[in-house]
């Protein structure tokens, strides 16, 4: 089972995965591409979000998806759709190459767990307008099948809301 936790920044992906791994040690954790690229490979990203930076993270995410065969137990911190959403929000004219890469790679997953932004979530975070806009784009992709990715791939998408414990139950293990 290859599961990706999807959502805008500062939504609780890391917390959810940490709790999941406490009781599911048999799963391999694929961390956030940004963290791996910076800490393990020494790559540098701009202080301001950019299409180029998110496209690089998308490429890396796709590489990591291809490393794991069907049947392996892997939990990914982000999925290609996340990066598509960021790119679409930053520059809708730049989505074509990203869309192609996402549609080719999404079938490497068995399930996506989408963490939507709650209406009352007013955290003090970096780039709050970007955070909200990306959540809106993710919502359109998952709930309304924008770009046709979900229907074309047949991937199972689960929406997880509430506390960390409630979200854990949504993962399905």
Cite the ranges covered by each PLM segment.
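Short loop/turn segments at strand-loop or loop-helix junctions that form parts
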Residues: 32, 77-81, 113-119
């Amino acid at each position: 089972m290859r599961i990706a936790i999807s959502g805008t920044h500062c939504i609780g992906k890391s917390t959810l995965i940490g709790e999941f791994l406490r009781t599911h040690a048999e799963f391999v954790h694929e961390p956030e591409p940004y963290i791996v690229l910076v800490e393990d490979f020494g790559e540098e990203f701009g202080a301001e979000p950019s299409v180029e930076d998110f496209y690089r993270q998308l490429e890396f995410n796709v590489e990591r998806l291809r490393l794991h065969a069907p049947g392996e137990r892997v939990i990914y911190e982000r999925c290609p759709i996340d990066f598509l959403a960021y790119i679409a929000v930053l520059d809708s004219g730049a989505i074509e190459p990203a869309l192609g890469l996402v549609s080719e790679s999404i079938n490497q997953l068995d399930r996506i767990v989408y963490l939507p932004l709650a209406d009352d979530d007013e955290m003090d975070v970096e780039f709050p307008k970007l955070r909200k806009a990306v959540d809106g784009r993710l919502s359109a992709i998952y709930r309304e099948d924008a770009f046709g990715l979900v229907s074309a791939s047949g991937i199972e998408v689960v929406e997880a809301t509430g506390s960390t414990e409630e979200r854990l139950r949504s993962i399905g293990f």
